[in-house]
């Protein structure tokens, strides 16, 4: 019950923040959840890349191996230059936010609060985790969060126990991670955001540049089939002027985007304790055998010395 209330509260807080925040909320993993049954396509691409077109580095750190029914942490790193600012939805400059999606193997879940160490509680303070869906507890989302405070996102993970879940097997499995900083260039509807380059739809001469609604600019291009008006929202800076000639597809603005998305895979081994104990027993036997050989050799040397050999 407590876990359900916690998840509900986290979802409500995230939803409110997304709806009232200055940045378009679809810039973060939360919105992949609204449009895709799974955040990972058959090709291996995480769907966040459909809206975040720029590629940026994302890193993940996980233990090489874990024991059943133990808590470990996956650290997703979303680095960027904190001195830069992005274009907000209203065209003003604003700080970047970050988000991440972690796709764990089946059986792995978010660790419950009462299983976290004091260190993990401190590292995860202020981070709200949500499941991708009710039937996918192994897929976790975080964000948006202030990037200057959360370039490292810690996910506390509970490893499964094959003894209590027969569908889980020991061995090596993969973790898929996606990390994002900043807003997207395309909305889920396919429309451009104001955080991307705007180009000319036709070739021709620019005959006028006028102001539009909410700080937008309207660029009029005289083409072969008449005038075409290109509406540029507040944010991108115009790089053309009246009298310029442009080709179809030529940039009318700069590229204001300073963020981007990256993904990475990692591997984790669910160790079988019996095999581990067997290995430790074998190593102990080898060590004892070596010690016995050394002692036997010294005993022989003493006997030989006593006999004057």
From Swiss-Prot:
Record flagged with keyword Iron: yes
Residues that coordinate or bind heme: 28, 48, 51-52
Pfam families linked: Apocytochr_F_C, Apocytochr_F_N
One MF annotation (Gene Ontology) recorded for this entry: iron ion binding
Keywords: Electron transport, Heme, Iron, Membrane, Metal-binding, Photosynthesis, Signal, Thylakoid, Transmembrane, Transmembrane helix, Transport
BP GO terms, sorted: photosynthesis
Cofactor comment text: Binds 1 heme group covalently.
PROSITE patterns, alphabetized: CYTF
Positions of transmembrane segments: 276-296
Signal peptide extent: 1-27
Domain of life of the source: Bacteria
UniProt-listed Gene3D superfamilies: 2.40.50.100, Cytochrome f large domain, Single helix bin
GO cellular component: plasma membrane-derived thylakoid membrane
Cofactor: heme
Xref: InterPro entries: Cyt-f_TM, Cyt_f, Cyt_f_lg_dom, Cyt_f_lg_dom_sf, Rudment_hybrid_motif
Localization annotation: Cellular thylakoid membrane
Membrane protein topology class: Single-pass membrane protein
Main location: membrane
Oligomeric form and interacting partners: The 4 large subunits of the cytochrome b6-f complex are cytochrome b6, subunit IV (17 kDa polypeptide, PetD), cytochrome f and the Rieske protein, while the 4 small subunits are PetG, PetL, PetM and PetN. The complex functions as a dimer.
Function: Component of the cytochrome b6-f complex, which mediates electron transfer between photosystem II (PSII) and photosystem I (PSI), cyclic electron flow around PSI, and state transitions.
Membership in a protein family: Belongs to the cytochrome f family.
Protein's name in the database: Cytochrome f
Organism: Synechococcus sp. (strain RCC307)
Source organism phylogeny: Bacteria, Bacillati, Cyanobacteriota, Cyanophyceae, Synechococcales
């Amino acid at each position: 019950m407590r876990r359900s209330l916690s998840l509900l509260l986290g979802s409500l807080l995230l939803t409110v923040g997304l709806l009232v925040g200055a940045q378009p909320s679809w810039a973060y993993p939360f919105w992949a959840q609204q449009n895709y049954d799974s955040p990972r396509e058959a090709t291996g691409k995480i769907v966040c890349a459909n809206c975040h077109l720029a590629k940026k580095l994302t890193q993940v750190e996980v233990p090489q191996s874990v024991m059943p029914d133990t808590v470990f942490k996956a650290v997703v790193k979303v680095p960027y230059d904190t001195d830069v600012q992005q274009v907000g939805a209203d065209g003003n400059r604003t700080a970047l936010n970050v988000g991440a999606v972690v796709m764990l193997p089946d059986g792995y879940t978010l660790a419950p609060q009462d299983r976290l160490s004091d260190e993990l509680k401190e590292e995860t303070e202020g981070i709200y985790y949500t499941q991708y869906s009710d039937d996918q507890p192994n897929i976790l989302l975080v964000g948006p969060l202030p990037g200057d405070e959360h370039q490292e996102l810690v996910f506390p993970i509970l490893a499964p126990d094959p003894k209590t879940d027969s569908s889980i097997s020991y061995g090596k499995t993969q973790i898929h991670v996606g990390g994002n900083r900043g807003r997207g260039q395309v909305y889920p509807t396919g429309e451009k955001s104001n955080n991307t380059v705007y180009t000319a739809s036709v070739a021709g001469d620019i005959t006028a540049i006028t102001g539009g609604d909410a700080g937008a600019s309207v660029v009029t291009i005289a083409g072969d089939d008449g005038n075409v008006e290109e509406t540029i929202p507040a944010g991108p800076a115009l790089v053309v002027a009246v009298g310029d000639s442009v080709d179809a597809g030529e940039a009318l603005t700069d590229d204001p985007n300073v963020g981007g998305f990256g993904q990475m895979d990692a591997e984790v081994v669910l160790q079988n304790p019996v095999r581990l104990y067997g290995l430790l027993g074998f190593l102990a036997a080898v060590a004892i055998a070596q010690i016995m050989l050394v002692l036997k050799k010294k005993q022989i040397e003493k006997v030989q010395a006593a006999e004057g050999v």
